[in-house]
Design a protein with these regions (language model features):
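Active-site histidine-anchored catalytic micro-motif
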Residues: 2-174
Length: 174
């Protein structure tokens, strides 16, 4: 029997932690997590990492906000179950196929926000917009994130593997 919080279908990635801000009254702390993803549609489970940050922050009652500044990623809450993750990836491919035409990738038409080294990633931007979740806020009670029995916090890479960031802000209500 697996333990309730054991990772099943998602990746746990190596991260570098940077404390960006801590209020003088210890009412809030903000962290940046730096990490590398490996592949398109990779699910990275950050539940334990976020819980550890909350535990070390000494915030008993408040909230945590997790945010990513990347338009080709998503933060979602769901089960860490291989079947679900495979279903999610399959449906995402059906809705936004990799081999479709994306005007974003058409350099003969596009004139805005262009870079020489840019990825061909129109589908990744569309997928990110459909999912529409680059941040989540959750309550913290007794120094624990309030999540359902099977819920996990995922960072989902919708583009190719590369360096990414998550920002975590923990606020105390006391």
């Amino acid at each position: 029997m697996k333990k309730p919080n054991q990772r099943i279908g998602a990746d746990v990635v190596k991260t570098e932690l940077v404390e960006l801000h801590k209020s003088s009254s210890n009412k809030s702390v903000t962290y940046a997590l730096h990490f590398d993803t490996e592949d398109t549609n990779q699910f990275c489970d950050f539940t334990e990492k976020i819980q550890n940050l909350i535990s070390s922050s000494n915030v008993a009652h408040g909230s945590v906000t997790i945010s990513t500044p990347h338009t080709t990623t998503a933060i979602i809450i769901n089960e860490s179950e291989t079947g679900y993750i495979n279903d999610f990836k399959r449906k995402l491919e059906e809705l936004v196929p990799t081999d479709s035409y994306y005007e974003h990738d058409d350099w003969d038409l596009r004139t805005e926000n262009m870079q020489e080294d840019e990825n061909v990633n129109g589908r990744s931007h569309v997928r990110g917009s459909i999912i529409g979740s680059t941040s989540v806020s959750l309550p913290v009670v007794d120094s624990e994130i309030i999540l359902g029995r099977w819920q996990r916090l995922f960072f989902v890479e919708l583009d190719c593997g590369r360096s990414r960031r998550l920002f975590v802000q923990i606020q105390d209500l006391n």
